[in-house]
Amino acid sequence: LMEDYVVYHLTGVRQIDYSLATRTMAFDISSLTWSREIFEAAEIDVSKMSAPVPTGTDAGKILESAAEEIGLSPDCHVISVSHDQVAAAVGAGVFDSSVAVDGAGTVECVTPVFDAMPDVDVMYNGYFSIVPYVIPGKYVAYAFSYTGGALMQWCTDTLAKKEKELAKEAGCSVNE
């Protein structure tokens, strides 16, 4: 995935956050390891995969060559972070099952936190993914609506025509 690719090129370390490893559908969310069963069925050598790590794991200092090329201090550390919806939940202060976060962007996503592993059969039958959260033993699920960004664009184009025109005249975005 993109995260571990970037981390590897910046540090030489192959690691990936649990929440992003989950996006491969080949990650066992119970054991927090790659699923040998899936890799064997697909005839893929699991050793080619980056090591799954908790969100916030330090991959170490940036390689001197990378630091020089992109203008960062060679003392800069590279940290594996999470899927954007997990980051949104953390940023919104959602740390237990009493609340959820609703993020709108390319998609709209409601992200509730579960204080323990939810019933996987119920979740999977509803087409919800279950993802390890930043707090050990907690999980999140993603309830996606793929019209998120498209709906916002439709509203701007249809309901905010005048505002869009005024923003264009002012040389700014209607979203500012």
Predicted stretch roles:
Residues 1-2, 7-15, 20, 25-36, ...:
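Active-site core segments that coordinate phosphate-bearing ligands/cofactors
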Residues 61:
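Extracytoplasmic/periplasmic/luminal assembly and interaction segments
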Residues 57-58:
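Glycine-rich, mobile lid/loop segments that gate access to catalytic sites or pores
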Residues 43-54:
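A conserved helix-loop-beta module that forms one wall/lid of the active-site cleft
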